[in-house]
Amino acid sequence: MSKKLFIGSSLLSKEQTGSVEFQISHLTNRVLKLTDHLKFHDKDYSSQRGLLKILGKRKRLLSYLSKTNLTSYETLINKLNIRKLKNR
């Protein structure tokens, strides 16, 4: 899914592309595309490294969102079918 189509299909407006919720949704879209790519190209180590970097960034953003706005965090988790963060 292209970025413009993704922005149009998301619940957020075009002015809110910098919001944490949109960034997490966009990173989730990139994760899905990279995992599909890695199913066919399992020795593409640079893409694996990029996937790990994206997952780390998404994890940090999810942690920030859970601390600042718990209700938005829970609705986003349910909408994107992502597992909740582990509590330490």
From Swiss-Prot:
It is found in: Plastid, Chloroplast. Disulfide bonds: none annotated. It comes from Physcomitrium patens (Spreading-leaved earth moss). InterPro entries: Ribosomal_uS15, Ribosomal_uS15_bac-type, uS15_NS1_RNA-bd_sf. Keywords: Chloroplast, Plastid, Ribonucleoprotein, Ribosomal protein. NCBIfam families: S15_bact. It comes from the Eukaryota. Part of the 30S ribosomal subunit. This is Small ribosomal subunit protein uS15c. GO terms for molecular function: structural constituent of ribosome. SMART domains: Ribosomal_S15 (SM01387). One of its GO terms (cellular component) is chloroplast. Its main location: plastid. GO terms for biological process: translation. Belongs to the universal ribosomal protein uS15 family. The keyword Chloroplast applies.
